[in-house]
Structure formats: C-alpha cells, structure tokens
C-alpha cells in the first residue's frame, strides 16, 4: 500500500468521495479513472505514469457508482510502499513504476516510472521504499 508520510508544506491531504467501479478496494491502493464511466477503478496493469487517486479505506463496492473515500495523488508528499520484486541497482533518484493492483512499486524492465525514490530500506522484494511523484 502507498501511505502518505510527509508533506512539503505541512498540510493534510483532503479526502474526496469519488464514484467507483464495482470491486474491492484497500486503503493505500492507487486508483485509475475509467475513461468510459469516469469512475475510479483498480489499476489492472503495471503503470509508468502517475495514478490520480489513492483509496483511503478498505471497502467493497457492490454497485458501480458508489462513492468511496480517496485523496488526489500529490507531488508535494512523500509516500511509503514496498517493492513487489527485487529492484537491483535502485538508488535514491531511481524512478519506479506502480505494480498492477496499485499496492506496490517495482523497477521497470525498460524506461522509468514516475515514483522517484527518496529513501530505500533495501532492494529486495518486500523492502520499504519512500518516494515522491515527479
């Protein structure tokens, strides 16, 4: 899960309620927006761009369109998550991608993502990593 840890300006992230596609969501899960319905949904593939929303509760949506609590992903915050797999060679400044499901980060096989590492506990799967969106 992606947890907001620290802000540049000391402000608290405001919550919004956005309509969601049917499904089960977890607090700290990054979400995309369905281009057809405009509702938030789980990320279904690895993502090298910045997702727009972060879910703020464990919730199951039975009926599409039910609002769920989210915050907008902010470039002014540092977030903490875990590595989905070993990220050999990752150092401060490495840009990671969001794994499918929106709960962890990984080092892309080619290119770079938009989650820039600011601190690492290690580079093994499951190690904590902190970063900001660039």
Where are these regions (language model features)?
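Surface-exposed, low-hydrophobicity beta-strand/loop segments enriched in small/polar/acidic residues
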Residues: 1-134
């Amino acid at each position: 899960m992606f947890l907001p840890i620290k802000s540049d300006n000391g402000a608290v992230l405001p919550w919004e309620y956005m309509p969601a596609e049917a499904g089960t969501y977890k607090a700290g899960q990054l979400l995309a927006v369905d281009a057809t319905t405009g509702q938030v949904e789980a990320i279904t593939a690895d993502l090298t761009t910045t997702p727009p929303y972060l879910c703020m509760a464990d919730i199951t949506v039975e009926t599409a369109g039910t609002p769920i609590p989210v915050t907008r992903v902010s470039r002014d915050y540092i977030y903490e998550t875990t590595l989905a797999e070993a990220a050999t060679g990752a150092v401060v400044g490495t840009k990671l991608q969001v794994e499918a499901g929106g709960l962890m980060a990984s080092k892309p096989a080619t290119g770079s993502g938009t989650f820039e590492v600011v601190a690492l506990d290690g580079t093994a799967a499951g190690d904590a990593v902190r970063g900001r969106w660039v």
